[in-house]
Amino acid sequence: TQYYLENRDRWPVHPVAAAFNAMGLDYFTLGNHDFNFGYEALRDYLRAMDGVCLCANVEDLGGELPIRPWAVHTLANGLRVGITGVVTDFVNVWEQPQNLERLRVTDAFQAALTACSSLRDQCDVRVCIYHGGFEEELETGRVLSDSGENIACKIARELDFDLLLTGHQHMAVEGIELSGTYAVQPP
C-alpha cells in the first residue's frame, strides 16, 4: 500500500481493491493493517471497493467512510442472511495515533453482541466476519493468549452466530463447531 500511495498515478484503482473486486466480494470487514496509512487512504480504498464494508466496531468520526455495522442479504431462495463484521480492537494498541484520527475502534465483543442482537429478528442465519483469531488451541482448549487480541472462541461460545469467519492469525482452521457456531479461518 505504501508503494501505491507514493505512485497513485500509475493505477486507476487501488490494487488491493481491484483484486478484491475481481473476486466478487459482496461483503467484507476491515483488518488491522487497513488502518496503517490513515483516514484518507482508508477512505479512498473503501470507495474503490465494490463490496459493502461491514465493521460494527469502527466509528467514522469524519463521516466519509462507507462502513455499515451489518446488513441483511436475502438469497434467491428467500433465506435471509444477517452479516456483521468486527476487527480486533487491538488496533488501538498497535496503530499510530495519527492513523486513527477521525476514527474510533470500540470493543469488538460488545459490537458483535449488539449486532447479533439487532439481527436476531431480521434474518434466518447470522454470520460474523471477525478480523481476529482464536484465543485457545481448538483441539485441547489450552489458552494461547488472554490478552484480548483474539476472541473468536468467546464470540462463538457466548453469542448466537451460526457462522464465524475469522482471519488474523494466518493459521488454517478448516472448520470447527464451537457451541453451535461453525467457525473457519483461512491460512
Model features per residue range: what roles?
Residues T1-P187:
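Acidic, metal/ion-coordinating pockets
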